[in-house]
Amino acid sequence: MKKLFASLAIAAVVAPVWAATQTVTLSVPGMTCSACPITVKKAISKVEGVSKVNVTFETREAVVTFDDAKTSVQKLTKATEDAGYPSSVKK
């Protein structure tokens, strides 16, 4: 029992170390006017774990920096889709 408790305690301390800040570029082709990036940025910014968002109308892209322990790319793309702007990871 003590070994189990010790293992869980170590895992709880080390788990945050496994989390990493990631940056992903999303393609958002549905942005058709200069006001669209504002909506996309607001939607992505509301996702927990997002630390930085830069949306560019000219390239129809959103560059997002986030904590992968708190959110995922799927949650980011869902946020843009829910705002009316489907997106995908730019290859």
Curated annotation (Swiss-Prot):
Secretion signal span: 1-19
GO cellular component terms listed in the entry, alphabetical order: periplasmic space
Cross-referenced Pfam families: HMA (PF00403)
Chief location: periplasm
Family membership noted in the UniProt record: Belongs to the MerP family.
Disulfide feature: none
UniProt-recorded Gene Ontology molecular function terms: mercury ion binding; mercury ion transmembrane transporter activity
UniProt KW keywords: Mercuric resistance, Mercury, Metal-binding, Periplasm, Plasmid, Signal
Gene that this sequence comes from: merP
Name of this protein: Mercuric transport protein periplasmic component
Ranges of residues in domain HMA: 22-88
CDD domains for the chain: HMA (cd00371)
Source organism per UniProt: Serratia marcescens
Description of how the protein assembles with itself and partners: Monomer.
Location in or out of the cell: Periplasm
Domain of life, per lineage: Bacteria
Function per UniProt: Involved in mercury resistance. Acts as a mercury scavenger that specifically binds to a mercuric ion in the periplasm and probably passes it to the cytoplasmic mercuric reductase MerA via the mercuric transport protein MerT.
Residues that coordinate or bind Hg(2+): C33, C36
